[in-house]
């Protein structure tokens, strides 16, 4: 992770922002399409002197912030590892190479935060990524057609479904539409409201040729909507081929600790 940038997309799954209590944060952000995501935020910038320079991915543990008054919530997402190509200081093309389950855990009650990024990188283990799966083509007919995302939280002997089980095709923007939107945002997003100027970030990072971008969190199940993370909890985010596995078989595998094939992307993080 130390060689790349980490970005995330806000508002790419209907009703997630409302559930997370973040809709008001984006009230000043206007979009041409009512279904469009709200914007892109950084969660890691290599070499930055700010908190965003802290390598915040740990695939085994999620470290809560030192301030114990802050509420942290899991955000189950899909991450894309992408190759970037530039022309005249602008992003020319984005090529997704791999995808994986991702936890974009976020602070929910930091009233001092003025940018969405300030809620994202709160410790050396505020993010986690599962085993990565090769993308044959990021378009209809490709491998992502067959994948769904689900998340669980284990607390003592109880396992709850934290986020809805959702097909990747359920993202508001996906495939070519998503890539065109990301390219536009990377080139034109300005420092406004809770968002930041992304072209400046790319320039200051010497135009990296690779990035991880998380493409939006799913909606929460009722049990996960107001359940904040506590030490000892175990977070699971799972991306699976729904033509080969159903939800009950994935749930039982997580519950029983059964081994699943590498074609299933699994993130398991113990909260500390």
PLM features: residue spans?
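Short, charged beta-turn/beta-strand-edge "cap" motif at the junction between a beta-strand
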Residues: 14, 217-223, 240-245
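Catalytic nucleophile loop of clan PA
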Residues: 223-229
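Glycine-enriched loop-and-adjacent helix/strand subsegments that border the catalytic/binding cleft
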Residues: 2-203, 227, 249-271
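Loop/turn positions that initiate beta-strands
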Residues: 208-210, 230-234
């Amino acid at each position: 992770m130390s060689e790349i940038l980490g970005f995330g997309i806000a508002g790419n799954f209907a009703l997630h922002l409302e559930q997370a209590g973040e809709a008001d944060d984006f009230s000043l952000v206007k979009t041409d399409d009512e279904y469009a995501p709200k914007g892109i935020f950084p969660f890691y910038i290599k070499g930055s002197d700010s908190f965003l320079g802290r390598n915040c991915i740990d695939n085994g543990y999620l470290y809560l912030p030192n301030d114990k008054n802050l509420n942290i919530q899991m955000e189950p997402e899909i991450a894309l590892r992408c190759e970037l190509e530039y022309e005249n200081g602008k992003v020319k093309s984005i090529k997704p190479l791999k995808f994986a389950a991702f936890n974009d855990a976020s602070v929910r009650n930091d009233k001092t935060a003025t940018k969405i990024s300030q809620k994202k990188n709160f410790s050396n283990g505020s993010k986690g990524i599962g085993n990565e799966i090769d993308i044959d083509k990021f378009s209809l007919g490709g491998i992502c057609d067959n994948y769904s995302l689900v998340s669980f939280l284990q607390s003592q002997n109880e396992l709850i479904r934290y986020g809805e089980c959702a097909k990747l095709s359920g993202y508001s923007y996906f495939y070519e539409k998503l890539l065109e939107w990301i390219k536009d945002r990377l080139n034109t997003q300005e420092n406004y409201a809770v968002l930041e100027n992304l072209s400046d970030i790319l320039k200051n990072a010497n135009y990296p040729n690779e990035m991880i971008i998380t493409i939006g969190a799913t909606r929460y199940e009722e049990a996960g909507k107001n359940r904040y993370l506590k030490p000892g909890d175990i977070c699971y985010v799972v991306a699976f081929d729904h033509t080969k596995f159903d939800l009950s078989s994935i749930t039982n595998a997580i519950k029983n600790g059964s081994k699943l094939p590498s074609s299933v992307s699994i993130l398991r993080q113990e909260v500390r």
